[in-house]
């Protein structure tokens, strides 16, 4: 006789927990969205790079062209004099400086 009210109370408790968590999660989402994407001044353009598949960086330049142009450039290492590709320059300098310290 007491099993049915206890079961209903448990279902109500779980429903209330789910509702509160959903509401707080949604409120957090709306708050973050309004803080990051909100445009309070209509004269200032909104800079966003949230479009899926966007190839533009924050300066509206094509990311793929920038990657290929910098990676294809070669820089000379001042420690050993070798020519290193731009994409590997930081790693090389790190190793080169470690060798020099030893």
Curated annotation (Swiss-Prot):
Location within or outside the cell: Nucleus
List the GO molecular function terms.
Answer: transcription coactivator activity; zinc ion binding
Q: Where are the zinc fingers (SGF11-type)?
A: 75-96
Cited InterPro entries: SAGA_su_Sgf11 (IPR013246)
Known Gene3D superfamilies for this protein? Answer: Classic Zinc Finger
**GO terms (BP aspect):** chromatin organization
One GO cellular component term, please give it. SAGA complex
Superkingdom of the source? Eukaryota
Database matches in Pfam families: Sgf11
* Keywords per UniProt: Activator, Chromatin regulator, Metal-binding, Nucleus, Transcription, Transcription regulation, Zinc, Zinc-finger
Q: Which family does it belong to?
A: Belongs to the SGF11 family.
The UniProt subunit note reads as follows: Component of the 1.8 MDa SAGA transcription coactivator-HAT complex. SAGA is built of 5 distinct domains with specialized functions. Within the SAGA complex, SUS1, SGF11, SGF73 and UBP8 form an additional subcomplex of SAGA called the DUB module (deubiquitination module). Interacts directly with SGF73, SUS1 and UBP8.
Functional summary from the UniProt entry: Functions as a component of the transcription regulatory histone acetylation (HAT) complex SAGA. At the promoters, SAGA is required for recruitment of the basal transcription machinery. It influences RNA polymerase II transcriptional activity through different activities such as TBP interaction and promoter selectivity, interaction with transcription activators, and chromatin modification through histone acetylation and deubiquitination. SAGA acetylates nucleosomal histone H3 to some extent (to form H3K9ac, H3K14ac, H3K18ac and H3K23ac).
Record's domain comment? The long N-terminal helix forms part of the 'assembly lobe' of the SAGA deubiquitination module. The C-terminal SGF11-type zinc-finger domain together with the C-terminal catalytic domain of UBP8 forms the 'catalytic lobe' of the SAGA deubiquitination module.
Its recorded name reads: SAGA-associated factor 11
């Amino acid at each position: 006789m007491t099993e049915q009210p206890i079961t209903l109370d448990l279902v109500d408790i779980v429903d209330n927990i789910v509702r509160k968590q959903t509401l707080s999660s949604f409120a957090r989402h709306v708050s973050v969205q309004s803080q990051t994407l909100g445009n309070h001044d209509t004269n200032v353009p909104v800079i966003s790079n949230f479009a899926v598949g966007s190839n533009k960086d924050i300066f509206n330049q094509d990311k793929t062209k920038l990657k290929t142009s910098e990676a294809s450039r070669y820089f000379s290492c001042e420690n050993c004099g070798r020519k290193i590709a731009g994409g590997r320059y930081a790693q090389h300098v790190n190793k080169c400086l470690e060798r020099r310290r030893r």
